[in-house]
Structure formats: C-alpha cells, structure tokens
Amino acid sequence: MTKVVCALSGGGAKTAAHLGAVRALRETGLVPAHYVGTSMGAIIAAVLAAGCSLEEARRLLSDLRLRDLAAPAPSALLGYFSRGLFRPGPFRRAVARLVPARRFADLEVALTITAVDTETGELALFGTGGRDDVPLVDALYAACALPVYYPPAEIDGRRYVDGGVRAVLPLDTAARFAPDVVFAVDVGPSWRELPADGTTRVPPLVRQSGQVQRILMAAYAEEMLGRWAARPVNADPELILVQPPVRAETTFRLDLVGAYEADGYRTAAQVLAERGARRDMP
C-alpha cells in the first residue's frame, strides 16, 4: 500500500483549502496515513486525524467566528508591554470545540504538529516523532502562537511560537516518516499571493508586522521548494504539491471558508489528474 503523508501549511482561514485538497486525494484512492501540520494547518490536520469526516470538518470550520480566534486582549492597551493582540483563552476553547480528541493517543491517524522553541530557534515536534505526552490543545496552541498576535505557549518551562516561523509548509518534517508520497498543500505566505483587495481593514503596525513575517516565511518556503525541485527525477519520496490561489491579508476571512475549500479541491483535482496522465504515459 502506498504510504501517503500529508503536509498541511499554515495560512489562517485559507487552510480550509486543505479539506478540499484531501477530498480530491481520497477520490483517487489514496488515503493519508499521517498528517503533518503547521499553524492553522495543524488544527485541520488534527481534526482529520481525529477521524472527523470532511463534511463534519467543514461544518466545524464554518461555525467558527472571528471572536473565537481573534478576541482582543485588554493588555493590548499597554502598548509595548503587551504580550499579544489577542487573548489565548478564546482561541484555545475554539480549538477544543473543533478537535474531538484531547490526547495524541486518542487520534485515529498519526499526527505531527510543528512549533518553534523561542530560546533555541529550533523546530519542535509534538505527536508522532516528537513529544506525545502534551495535551493536544496545548500543542495546537503552540503551533498557532504567531508572534504579535498571540502570547507564546508555555509547556514545561519552554516557550513556543507558531511553527510557520521556521517552516510554514512542513515538507521536510513530512519526509522524515518514510513516505512513498508527500501530499503537500500550500496556502501560506508566498510570492505568488494576489494583492490584498482592500476590503479588510488592518492597523498599520499589524500590517507592517505581517509584511515582515510574510517575507521571511515566503523566502524560507521558496528555498525549501527549490531544494525539492532540484532532486533527481523519480526521487523518493514523490512530491505532489498543491498550491491553490491565495490573496494577501485574508488570514482571518472566515467568511471565505467555502471558497477556500472549493479552490483546494479544484487545484488538487487538476494536479492529481496531471499526475495520473504522466503515470499513464508509455
């Protein structure tokens, strides 16, 4: 049986595209044996690894509201001394509602979550291949604790932030688990993003911080994808890369979840059809 490891990028609400992409993958008969997720992609990965159907996952995601993910922190009034713009409590409660599992041991499919240790700068893994004794909601908060927006997660005396700080698309992590195929869905910051449409009001300081993070994340992703593209033809593991269209400044556009999912399905179906055509060539 072909071992498929799904690498799901960060990207906020845009990660709804992962649901559509995984649906297209399953329609080909390939079944994910392992999910590796970064940032909000880690939450989507956890929902699927817990055994939720794609329909249930879509419903859970559609029920999210902005106040669940971005509840303003009173401490933001402290200016320079604030730990983050948003309160972690509402976010953690939203994650607990989304993911019907409390421990990694409760999951039906292997799951690996990435975060970054703020002291060492190293990528930290939770779940398969890393620490699996941490409550799932703690690991998921760590994976999503994007600097400026949320305070770092504190786990056993260590502080962790969003895994996207090191690798918004966890391709290299997925490759650690001896897959035959890495099915990677990328909706994170990149140079291919369409410009913001101007409908989202973003405070200047937040926009500047987001632009810097986008540059750093996009540069790392470009370097990593370049390394993978430079591999010999037919190198193992096979990479199936799905990159749905994305637009800047839509991280919190929960009203577009349905459109993102449709984009993920359409793009993945096309990529998979092209893969099938290549494999059928003499």
Label every PLM stretch briefly.
Residues 99-112:
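A short alpha-helix-loop-beta-strand transition element characteristic
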Residues 111-117, 151:
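Short beta-strand scaffold segments in enzyme catalytic cores
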Residues 1-35:
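Helix-rich "cap/lid" substructures immediately adjacent to catalytic or cofactor-binding pockets
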Residues 9, 32-50:
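Catalytic nucleophile loop
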Residues 15-18, 42, 167-171:
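Short glycine/serine/threonine-rich phosphate/pyrophosphate-binding segments
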Residues 2-4, 54-94, 116-118, 122-123, ...:
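Non-catalytic peripheral regions of patatin-like phospholipases
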Residues 135-173:
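ATP/pyrophosphate-binding catalytic subdomain of soluble kinases
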Residues 11, 21, 41, 113, ...:
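Conserved small-residue
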